[in-house]
């Protein structure tokens, strides 16, 4: 009886300690009424890093939480995951309105930054180790955050996204929008793209986020030219030029583009890959310096 009771208590204790995705309803300035979900592992690193993980169109925080193995890596490495969720525009992120494209002005971007600040305060997080990643619309928002809030994010990883400001002024940025100019590969000069980012935070002279850009070469929804344009943009902003192309990295069928010494900007293009998530958690976390 004693053994059985002890085992029952142990199981109950383990159940109570098991981390899970939790909604936070009050986290600060939230002009577009987006939702915040957070995953805090049971064993946190001292002054833990924070990753913002952004879902695609039609997705949700819960869907993206289950869509990668990042929660398992968080358990093993003690970092916090924030999963923003938008109920607007077919669950697509606002990447087109001036507010979200301008530092401190509003939009989805400001709500997400509020989530970051809340998390850093509540869990004594490391403000120098805040990162963003996302697929499709989430990748697009990752670029917006890196452009509008370079003082918040140390690095980003964009999967099947578009350049910062690519959809500026559009009525919406959903797959159902009649205006698909951006997603079909809108082209500008590197200087023009770079100016979009610099103008998002006028007068800012601090460091800029390190960026990785991933895209499938068979993507017809968001054309691979979009990734080329994003690389032009960040190459201009970060002041690095293409120095090397390596086949078979991170796996057969992929080509890696290295800019400068590779520490600030990298691009990856996959043969036979359409519009699909290609998140390699180990590669991502190595880029963020978390493993």
UniProtKB/Swiss-Prot annotation:
Function statement: Feruloyl esterase which acts in synergy with xylanases in degradation of plant cell walls. Hydrolyzes the ester linkage of hydroxycinnamic acids (ferulic acid (FA) and p-coumaric acid) and diferulates present in plant cell walls. Efficiently releases ferulic acid (FA) from destarched wheat bran when incubated with an M3 xylanase.
Domain of life of the organism encoding this protein: Eukaryota
CC annotations in GO: extracellular region
Catalysed reactions listed for this entry: feruloyl-polysaccharide + H2O = ferulate + polysaccharide
Entry keyword annotation includes Signal: yes
GO annotation terms (biological process): xylan catabolic process
UniProt EC number: 3.1.1.73
Biological source species: Thermothelomyces thermophilus (strain ATCC 42464 / BCRC 31852 / DSM 1799)
Enzyme class per UniProt: hydrolase
Family statement drawn from the similarity comment of this UniProt entry: Belongs to the carbohydrate esterase 1 (CE1) family. Feruloyl esterase type B subfamily.
Residues listed as glycosylation sites in the UniProt record: 117, 179
PANTHER family on file: FERULOYL ESTERASE B, UNNAMED PRODUCT-RELATED
Pfam family name, one: Esterase_PHB
InterPro entries: AB_hydrolase_fold, Esterase_phb, Plant_Biomass_Hydrol_Est
Entry's localization field: Secreted
UniProt signal peptide: 1-18
Protein name: Feruloyl esterase B
Molecular function terms, GO-annotated: feruloyl esterase activity
Active site feature: 136
Thermal properties: Optimum temperature is 50 degrees Celsius.
Keywords: Carbohydrate metabolism, Glycoprotein, Hydrolase, Polysaccharide degradation, Secreted, Serine esterase, Signal, Xylan degradation
Noted pH dependence of activity: Optimum pH is 7.0.
């Amino acid at each position: 009886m004693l053994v059985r009771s002890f085992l029952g208590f142990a199981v109950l204790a383990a159940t109570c300690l098991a981390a899970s995705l939790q909604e936070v309803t009050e986290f600060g300035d939230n002009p577009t009424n987006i939702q915040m979900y957070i995953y805090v592992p049971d064993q946190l690193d001292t002054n833990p890093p924070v990753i913002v993980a952004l879902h695609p169109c039609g997705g949700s925080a819960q869907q993206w939480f289950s869509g990668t193995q990042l929660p398992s890596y968080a358990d093993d490495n003690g970092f916090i995951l924030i999963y923003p969720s938008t109920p607007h525009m077919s669950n697509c992120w606002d990447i087109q309105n001036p507010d979200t494209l301008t530092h401190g002005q509003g939009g989805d971007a400001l709500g997400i930054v509020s989530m970051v600040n809340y998390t850093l305060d509540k869990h004594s997080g490391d403000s120098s180790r805040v990162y963003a990643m996302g697929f499709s619309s989430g990748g697009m928002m990752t670029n917006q955050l890196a452009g509008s809030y370079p003082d918040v994010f140390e690095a980003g990883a964009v999967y099947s996204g578009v350049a910062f400001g690519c959809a500026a002024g559009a009525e919406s940025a959903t797959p159902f929008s009649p205006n698909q100019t951006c997603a079909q590969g809108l082209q500008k000069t590197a200087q023009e793209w770079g100016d979009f980012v610099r103008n998002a935070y006028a007068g800012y002279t601090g460091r800029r986020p390190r960026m990785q850009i991933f895209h499938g070469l068979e993507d017809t929804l968001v054309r691979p030219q979009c990734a080329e344009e994003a690389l032009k943009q960040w190459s201009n902003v970060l002041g690095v030029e293409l120095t090397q192309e390596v086949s078979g990295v991170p796996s057969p069928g992929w080509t890696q583009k290295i800019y400068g010494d590779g520490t600030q900007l990298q691009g990856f293009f996959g043969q036979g890959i359409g519009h699909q998530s290609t998140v390699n958690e180990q590669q991502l976390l190595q880029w963020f310096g978390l493993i």
